[in-house]
Amino acid sequence: MSDVPGEDSPTHFYPVNFENYLRPKQSIKCQPLQRFKKPNERATNLYRNLKRLKILRWYNRVSKRFEEFPLPKFLGFLQARNDDGLCKRKTGFEIYCEMASIHGFHIFVGAKTWQRILWWLLICNAVLLSFTLVIMSLSMSKETPTIRFIDTMMKPTAEVPFPAVTICGFNTKEWMNSSQIVNQRNASWLELLEDLALPICPQIKICQWDNRMVNCLDQLQPIWTLDQRLCCSFNYNKQLFSSYLGVSFVLRSNDEILQSSKSAGFEVLIHESHEIPNGATPRVFVPGESDAHIMLRPYINRFTKNLKGLSLQKRGCYFSTERRLILSDVYNQINCLAECRTESILKSCGCIPPKSPIEKSWLICDLKQMQCVIDFDHDEIISGEQKNCDCLPPCEFNRYEFQSDIRFIKGMINNSIVNTSNQETTNEVRVRVYYDSAIAEELLLDVYENWLTFIGTFGGITGLFMGCSFVSVFELIFFSCVRPTCNWLTRQQILWRRRRNQRVGITESRSLGPAN
C-alpha cells in the first residue's frame, strides 16, 4: 500500500474497545475512529541542529534500550505499549491513570518506558516524603500534646477577678520577758507565734473598694502565711471584680507596739484570692510615710473543651475541681506544694508546724519538735530537691504582673481618701492597688492537634507533594472496588443469559423434535 491513498483506496477505520457496560445499545450511535495521516510539517532550525549533532539519534537509541530493558513482573505497567492505543485492550490501571486527578499518573499511559520509569521514581519519592512529614507531625503532636496561644488582647478587666491584696509588717512586739517564756517551756509553739505576732488589720484605718464611699474594713481578715507571718488580707477566698479603680488603704502604725523603728514599712503581696501567700509570692516593699500606687496587669489563662478529652499525663495540668485540697475547694499549685511539705514533715517528725495546712487528726509540733522541723528544711535545702507530690500547675488561672510608684508623703496635701481633720500623719502609709488598663490579655490552652487539624495537615502535605484530595481517594476506591465489582456482575449476568438462552434453545429443540 502506498503512503498516499488513492481515490479508490478504502478508508482505514479503527473500532473502539468499549467495556461491556459502556457499550452503546444502539449501533447507530457507534462512531468509528478514522486514522488521519499526519501532515508533513516543516522542520525547525532546532530540529535540524539537534539532528546535525546526532542528539536525536542518541536519544532514540537510549529510548529503544529502555524499551528492551527487562523489568520485573510487578513493574510491567512501566513498559511502553507497542501499539497506538486503539487495537490493544486497555487494562484497568491504564484507564485509572488516564482519569486520575493525582499529578503524574497520566504519564503511565502513552509515554515511553524511560519516561514512565522517571515519573514512577518521582511519585515514589513524593509518597515517601509526604508520609515522612505526616509521621513527623504525629510525633510532634505526641511529644507536645497541648499548646498555649493568645486568644485575645482585648479582654475587659471588669471580667477578670481582682487579686487578693495581703499586707504584712516588718515590726514585732517588744516582749521583755519573751526569753523567760521560752525557758519556762510553759508556752507552746503556737501560743508563742500568736503572742509575738503584730496584728496588721487594726493598723488599717481606711479601706475603700472601687473608689466607693463604702468602708471595706469589714472585708479584711487576718491570715497566716506559709512562712508563719501574721498578715492582713483583702479579697481572700472571695471573688470581686473591678474595672480599674481598685482598692485603697491608709495604714497608721501604733507607736506603743513598735519595737524601735517608726518607718520600717510594710510589704504588699499580690496573689490569687484562693492562694495562701508564701515566701515566693510577688510583693512590693512600701516604706513608712509614703504613698504607693501599685498598677496591675492581669493575664488570664483558660482552656478549651478539647482539653477534657486528654489524660492527665498528656495535658500536664489539673482542672479546678479535679484534685481535692485541704486549704480550698479550688486547686492551686502553691497550696498543693504546701500540703505536700506538711505531709512530709508529719511523716518525718510525727507532727506539723503551727499555722500549716492541717487535718483534724494531725498533731501540732511543740517547741521540743522545732529542731526536727528545722533539720527537715535544712536537709531539703542541701539536697536541692523538693517532692512535688504530682502538684501540677492548674489548667485555668490568673497571673498578675505589676509596677509600683512610691512617693514620700511628707509635705503632701491629704487626698480624698484621708480625713481632712488635723491628725498626725506620723508613720502613715497610703496604698492603692488598681488595674493600669481597661483591657487584658487572655491566653488559651488547647490540644496541639485534633482530628480536624490532622485532616488539614494530612491534606496539605499530600496535596503539596502528590496533588491528592478527597476526589483522588474516591477515584481510587471506585477503580479498585466499585468498577471491578460492576465488571464481575456484568460478566456474571452475560454468562447467566447465555446459559438461559442455551436452556431455552435445548427445550425448544426437544419440544419440536417429536412433532417433526
UniProtKB/Swiss-Prot annotation:
Keywords of the record, alphabetical order, are:
Ion channel, Ion transport, Membrane, Sodium, Sodium channel, Sodium transport, Transmembrane, Transmembrane helix, Transport
State the annotated membrane topology for this chain. Answer: Multi-pass membrane protein
One Gene Ontology term, aspect cellular component: membrane
The transmembrane segments are 117-137, 454-474
Q: Name one GO biological process term.
A: sensory perception of salty taste
The protein's predominant localisation is membrane
Provide the tissue specificity. Expressed in embryonic and larval tracheal systems in the dorsal trunk and transverse connective (TC), but not in the junction between the dorsal trunk and TC, and in several tracheal branches and terminal cells. In larvae, also expressed in ventral pits. Expressed in the taste-sensing terminal organ of the larval head. In adult, expressed in hairs on the tibia, femur, tarsi of the leg and wing margin.
One Pfam family linked to the record: ASC
In alphabetical order, the GO MF annotations are: ligand-gated sodium channel activity; sodium channel activity
> Where in the cell?
Membrane
UniProt-listed InterPro entries = ENaC (IPR001873), ENaC_CS (IPR020903)
This chain's function reads: Part of a complex that plays a role in tracheal liquid clearance. In both larvae and adults, contributes to the behavioral response to salt. Probable role in sodium transport.
What family is reported? Belongs to the amiloride-sensitive sodium channel (TC 1.A.6) family.
Stated name of the protein: Pickpocket protein 11
User: Which gene name does the record give?
Assistant: ppk11
